[in-house]
Amino acid sequence: MRPVKLVIVGDGAVGKTCMLISYTTNAFPNEYIPTVFENYNSSLVVDDVKINLGLWDTAGQEDYDRLRPLSYPSTDVFLVCFSVIAPASYENVEGKWKPEIDQHCPNVPIILVGTKIDIRDDPEQVKRLAEKNIVPIQPPQGDELAKKIGAVKYIECSALTQANLKLVFEEAVRAVLAKAAKEPTGKKEKGGKKGCSLF
């Protein structure tokens, strides 16, 4: 079974932990629990390859900016998440998360993930957002941001309804497998076996 280390990053309260819990347990947590660092494991088969997926959850709050990179060494793929109903979290992908990943883990594949699409599609929720002058992020904006940051793919999902949730993790594994297929056998990247190190 091939091990793959996936680290999920993004602003606080964008739904990172809910994604992981919903994916690994098929149950949506009913309350917000701020994360410091949590690890989960999942086994899956992607394109006939058996994968032991190590899922590393991180805290998005600024208080953890110095601790969070401790979970980065040996990362195979990042999920960079933003909430489609929180434009500031979308802007922070380019302003904060991409630079942080580039500093610690250049050349590690990124999947850009737009979360909470169930809320964007709910007329009542959209009305509430409009009252706060919030316009939800739409798919073309996610596609554009993915190109800007060099992400392998942009996927939208909902941890609540599980729409596209499995696809997020399958595509993350595919990004790792595709990168491995392109690398010369036995060649190590600068900074360690996977091109991600801590300085």
From Swiss-Prot:
InterPro entries: P-loop_NTPase (IPR027417), Small_GTP-bd (IPR005225), Small_GTPase (IPR001806), Small_GTPase_Rho (IPR003578)
EC identifiers of the protein: 3.6.5.2
Top-level taxon: Eukaryota
PANTHER family: RHO FAMILY GTPASE
Organism: Entamoeba histolytica (strain ATCC 30459 / HM-1:IMSS / ABRM)
UniProtKB keywords: Cell membrane, Cytoplasm, Cytoskeleton, GTP-binding, Hydrolase, Lipoprotein, Magnesium, Membrane, Metal-binding, Methylation, Nucleotide-binding, Prenylation
Protein encoded by which gene: RACG
Entries under SUPFAM superfamilies matching the protein: P-loop containing nucleoside triphosphate hydrolases (SSF52540)
Protein name (Swiss-Prot/TrEMBL): Rho-related protein racG
